[in-house]
Amino acid sequence: MAKLDAYFGEYGGQYVPQILVPALEQLEQAFIDAQEDPDFRSEFMTLLQEYAGRPTALTLCRNLTKGTKTKLYLKREDLLHGGAHKTNQVLGQALLAKRMGKDEIIAETGAGQHGVATALACALLGLKCRVYMGAKDVERQSPNVFRMKLMGAEVIPVHSGSATLKDACNEALRDWSATYETAHYLLGTAAGPHPFPTIVREFQRMIGEETKMQILAREGRLPDAVIACVGGGSNAIGMFADFIEEESVKLIGVEPAGKGIDTDQHGAPLKHGKTGIFFGMKAPLMQDEHGQIEESYSVSAGLDFPSVGPQHAHLNAIGRAEYGAVTDDEALDAFKILARNEGIIPALESSHALAYALQLAQAEPEKEQLLVVNLSGRGDKDIFTVHDILKEKGEI
């Protein structure tokens, strides 16, 4: 039986209760078989094209970098059906679940984007769907909760712990431990126990593949850097995967600095965490001196995660990718700048990557550089949050 690597350097692995090991082994084998089956690939690609709307556009920002010699392109995952990159890998995993003969799907969600993507895939493919969501996030993201319910999903609020994403993750895994014979756990990011980080990367890698083809067609060369926000890290690894071997291309991930890296209110475990075991994997983790998981914080619910995918941890450790951090305020500024100058309202998550790109352009205005930002999602879900913040600041 062929096996995928369970580790990326020292990170990754499969730290789960023994009861889940057979389910993960079955999933790994089903994924390997599916990848070698042209019918599976064909069905997946057809859904991506005809249902989700791939390939997504690569848009040159005409106004954003005026006064500098930077050319900035956006990879428009915000245009995907469902409103974010999440739809890509959810369709892949839902097809995989059907292939394994499972008709129930369990998912966790923070901002609600993964929950919405899971609900739409289940509606399309005739699967039962239950989504665990921190009770705080249920309040913060009511439009997405209603969207999930409209598409037939059961949304289960989680009140334990901090009532946010990490608690929803724990509840979803607990559910799967009892139901894995009939249910598939559709994990929402490139993290968690092996083989999930690899599966999610492979079902997201078309982001980078398309970007490479599109930028070569437009500019005749590869970009100097590709930039993506990092929570768990699926949109970033989808963008990075096809560029890892291209040494001339910088890979830049952007973590949420929240209210400041020097405060305890951020979500930047890669640069400011310690290695630990969480959510079935060994990875950098926000923890206190006793090893207890600390609360992460970000204005964007989708980046509010106390750990990070193991491949990002490895790319950081070997120096192949670099990881910066952007505060809430910097992300909000980028959100407003893109809306006012290009007529595109980005997700707050994606605004972190955009803010970093704008800082690069402004730091060296005379430098000719070609940058691509993965605009991982659209900002419809965030307009009420942004409205309230701007009102509080007296800006509206």
Curated annotation (Swiss-Prot):
Q: Per its UniProt record, what Gene3D superfamilies does this chain match?
A: 3.40.50.1100
Q: Which GO terms describe its cellular component?
A: cytoplasm
Gene symbol here is: trpB
Where on the chain is N6-(pyridoxal phosphate)lysine found, per UniProt?
A: K86
- Functional summary from the UniProt entry: The beta subunit is responsible for the synthesis of L-tryptophan from indole and L-serine.
Could you say which EC number(s) this protein's record lists?
4.2.1.20
Q: What is this protein called?
A: Tryptophan synthase beta chain
Give the SUPFAM superfamilies listed for this entry: Tryptophan synthase beta subunit-like PLP-dependent enzymes
Read off the InterPro entries from this record: Trp_synth_b_CS, Trp_synth_beta, Trp_synth_beta/beta-like, TrpB-like_PALP, TrpB-like_PALP_sf
GO MF terms held by the record: tryptophan synthase activity
Q: Which UniProt keywords apply?
A: Amino-acid biosynthesis, Aromatic amino acid biosynthesis, Lyase, Pyridoxal phosphate, Tryptophan biosynthesis
Specify the species: Aliivibrio fischeri (strain ATCC 700601 / ES114)
Q: Does the keyword Nuclease apply?
A: no
How is this protein organized at the quaternary level? Answer: Tetramer of two alpha and two beta chains.
Q: Which Pfam families match?
A: PALP
